[in-house]
């Protein structure tokens, strides 16, 4: 018939023309630890009801016949009406990834009024108290986290990880997430990478430990580092007289001119952070306008060579910084 199987582990097939996914009814039997520790059974004796019993939540355990009738043995339709995220069966606790999935769904559906049912949250806690969460691949942890950061209420995801105690298995050591910062900033910035940087940079935790625990890609880790440097620099403005060369040195250290687009992206976080959290008064550094001006500088003479060019450009940049600070001071 031309159907192609997606991967080798699950009985999911792509239609040859429409590329729609078609899945055979299946059940899984726990055969090892972690998210992948299952033996799949998709023989002809497996019924649709058997398949639905293995689903995570009742709202995901609903099927529809060709004539439009719903097959809903676990009252998923009722839970949708009541805005409840409820586990289907004891099979829920066999897959540790479901703790993160349900936390993520709670964050994505918060705006519709959904919340996690009490017994389901207890089961999530039970999973968290085992060692199963430690078996999850880092890329799957980040995948769920990234999806949550894309939604309207990313702070709910982390709140549920804390409520379910999952966070204490994922992250070693002491830490504190400032979820109010994430909630405020998420109304101004939409990119998941920026939201993550804003969250952990303002939290009481070791950046390397948190990034490692959540499987954060290197390029996003760099955003966190740069944002942290800029926030600390801005905080120091309250207590110290910043010299022109210190501003230029910082911009150069953070590669703000050569990687200007990345720098601007981080400055957007800083602006939102300043508006909702720091609310700094006094000396103000117009970082974005300043970086664009510094980037446009050319040698003042065509006769300059090598080190002379670098020294000339640096002097011009320091002059621009002095003028901008005077204008905004």
State where each predicted segment sits.
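Catalytic cores of the polymerase beta-like nucleotidyltransferase superfamily
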Residues: 1-329
């Amino acid at each position: 018939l031309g159907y192609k199987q997606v991967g080798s582990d699950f009985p999911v097939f792509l239609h040859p023309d429409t590329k729609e996914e078609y899945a055979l009814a299946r059940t899984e039997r726990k055969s090892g630890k972690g998210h992948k520790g299952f033996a799949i059974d998709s023989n002809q004796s497996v019924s649709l009801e058997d398949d639905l019993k293995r689903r995570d939540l009742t709202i995901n355990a609903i099927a529809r016949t060709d004539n439009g009738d719903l097959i809903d043995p676990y009252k998923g339709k009722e839970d949708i009406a009541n805005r409840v995220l409820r586990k289907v069966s004891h099979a829920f606790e066999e897959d540790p990834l479901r703790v993160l999935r349900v936390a993520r769904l709670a964050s994505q559906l918060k705006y519709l009024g959904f919340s996690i049912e009490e017994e389901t949250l207890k089961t999530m806690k039970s999973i968290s108290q085992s060692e199963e969460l430690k078996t999850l691949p880092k890329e799957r942890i980040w995948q769920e986290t990234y999806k949550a950061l894309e939604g309207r209420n990313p702070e709910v995801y982390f709140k549920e990880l804390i409520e379910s105690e999952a966070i204490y298995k994922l992250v070693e050591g002491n830490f504190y997430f400032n979820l109010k910062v994430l909630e405020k900033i998420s109304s101004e910035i939409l990119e998941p990478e920026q939201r993550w940087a804003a969250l952990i940079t303002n939290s009481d935790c070791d950046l390397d430990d948190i990034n490692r625990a959540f499987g954060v890609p290197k390029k996003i880790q760099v955003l966190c580092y740069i944002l942290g440097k800029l926030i600390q620099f801005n905080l120091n403005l309250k207590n110290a007289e910043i010299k022109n060369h210190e501003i230029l040195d910082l911009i150069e250290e953070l590669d703000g001119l050569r990687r200007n687009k990345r720098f601007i992206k981080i400055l957007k976080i800083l602006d939102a952070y300043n508006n909702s959290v720091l609310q700094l008064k006094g000396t103000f550094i117009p970082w974005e306008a300043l970086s664009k001006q510094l980037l446009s500088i050319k040698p003042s003479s065509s006769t300059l060579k090598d080190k002379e060019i670098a020294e000339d450009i640096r002097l011009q940049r320091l002059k621009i910084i002095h003028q901008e600070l005077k204008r905004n001071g």
